Amino acid sequence: MDEELDYLWETLGLEITADLWPERDKIHPTLRPAITVVQAKYRRASFLIMRMSWHAGLPDLKRIQASLVELSGMPTVISEAHLEQRQRERLQQQRIPFICPGVQAYLPFMDEEYWSGKPN
């Protein structure tokens, strides 16, 4: 998750710390090997960042993100390097947080909605 944290620091100036999510055993056993989940902290906010080990489609990402929100009770950010502009727009319309390192970050649960973008 260093790429995501570096991007948030270098682009937005957000100094976020993160460690592996301590409640990882709540993730379904068949999904556990395919997902990395860290618990991130920024100021007083605590949230999860999830990244799949393969390029998952948007419906799968949204389904897994929703289940992690339910399991953890925390906002959960999707990290995916290959989101197309229309996919990012769709996530924003649905207020689903995401990081597309080097392109855009959308974190609506923070005090402000941080985002930065470069055209595709």
Language-model-derived ranges and their functions:
Residues 1-96:
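DNA-contacting interfaces and partner/effector-binding or oligomerization modules
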Residues 87, 108-110:
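Short secondary-structure boundary/hinge segments and terminal tails
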Residues 95-107:
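Charged, structured surface patches that assemble and position nucleic-acid processing machinery
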Residues 112, 116-119:
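N-terminal intrinsically disordered, cationic/polar leader segments
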